[in-house]
A protein has these predicted regions:
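Acidic catalytic/metal-coordinating carboxylates
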Residues: 45-48, 71-75
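Charged docking surfaces used in two-component/phosphorelay signaling
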Residues: 29-33
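C-terminal output helix
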Residues: 116-125
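Conserved acidic carboxylate
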Residues: 22
Length: 129
């Protein structure tokens, strides 16, 4: 098996600060396990994601596209108004081209389908940061 060991640093050389917007506990647990070396903050809807990006500094956002209260597309658009450069990776169970296009048009930098694969996520991190 491939062994990805990444030592990415975040803002000011501190540990990478990752915001995960994911309402499903199982999906969150998987992402948290993959990224256990980093500082993770979880929110469960788009409203909370926008508030966190407004109030705190993050190096990257992992954004579920289907969440209650405010979905990932709308949250991504609002985050782009606050921070046009933060990398946002869309997470979705939908692998259709239209979903990928919608995510990119909203402002996502990349698009991953669930269930997430460790290698794909870590590969994106190495390119995006």
């Amino acid at each position: 098996p491939l062994n990805h060991s990444i030592s990415l640093k975040g803002i000011n050389g501190k540990d990478l600060q990752i915001l995960i917007a994911e309402d499903n506990d199982s999906n969150y647990s998987l992402v948290k396990h993959i990224l256990k070396e980093y500082q993770i903050t979880r929110v469960v809807n788009g409203v909370e994601a926008v508030e966190k990006v407004r109030d705190e500094e993050f190096d990257i956002v992992l954004m579920d596209m289907k969440m209650p209260i405010m979905g990932g597309l709308e949250a991504t658009r609002k985050i782009r108004e606050l921070n046009p450069i933060i990398p946002i990776i869309a997470l979705t169970a939908n692998a259709f081209d239209a979903d990928r296009v919608s995510a990119m048009e909203a402002g996502c930098n990349a698009f991953l389908t669930k269930p997430l694969k460790k290698e794909e996520l870590l590969e994106l991190f190495s390119f995006k940061l």
